[in-house]
């Protein structure tokens, strides 16, 4: 009995050791895919600022022209930073706040149906960007990122937190 448990534990450990090798490629995929999507979204907004300003005006956002420019730049440059893995967690934090605000201002009905009609929440435009941002915020950019190179060259920016 004890030998079986030891063998199962060994198989379990080896399986999750192998799976852990997929973490950085997965994070790279998340950063590249959603970074590219943000770049395209920001680029489109930058080239149609009048339409974005008009939309933000219809939402009664303060300073709609300045907000449109700021959000467009955030999505474009934030998408670039996310894709290459530069200042990843800071970028992901700002993008997370941006996507939450997109829900609050532009997709309020979807936000309030998170429990009553989750499909509406999942189908809203900010959802995948929000999830991608949260993934990078919580898990970092992975090994294949500019942040990782900077950390190797200059050392960690803050001491690691013990769990």
Regions found by a protein language model. Name each.
Residues 49-62, 89:
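Short juxtamembrane and helix-loop transition motifs at transmembrane-helix boundaries
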Residues 1-43, 47, 65-73, 77-163:
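Extended, low-polarity transmembrane helix blocks
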């Amino acid at each position: 009995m004890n030998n079986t448990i030891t063998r199962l534990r060994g198989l379990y450990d080896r399986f999750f050791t192998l799976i852990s090798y997929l973490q950085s490629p997965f994070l790279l995929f998340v950063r590249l895919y959603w970074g590219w999507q943000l770049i395209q979204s920001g680029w489109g907004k930058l080239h149609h600022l009048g339409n974005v300003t008009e939309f933000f005006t219809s939402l009664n956002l303060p300073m709609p022209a300045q907000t449109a420019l700021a959000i467009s730049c955030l999505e474009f440059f934030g998408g670039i930073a996310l894709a290459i893995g530069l200042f990843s967690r800071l970028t992901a934090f700002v993008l997370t706040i941006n996507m939450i605000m997109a829900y609050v201002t532009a997709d309020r009905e979807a936000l309030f149906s998170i429990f009553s009609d989750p499909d509406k929440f999942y189908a809203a435009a900010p959802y995948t960007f929000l999830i991608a941002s949260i993934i990078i915020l919580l898990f970092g950019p992975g090994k294949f990122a500019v942040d990782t190179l900077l950390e190797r060259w200059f050392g960690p920016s803050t001491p690691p937190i013990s769990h």
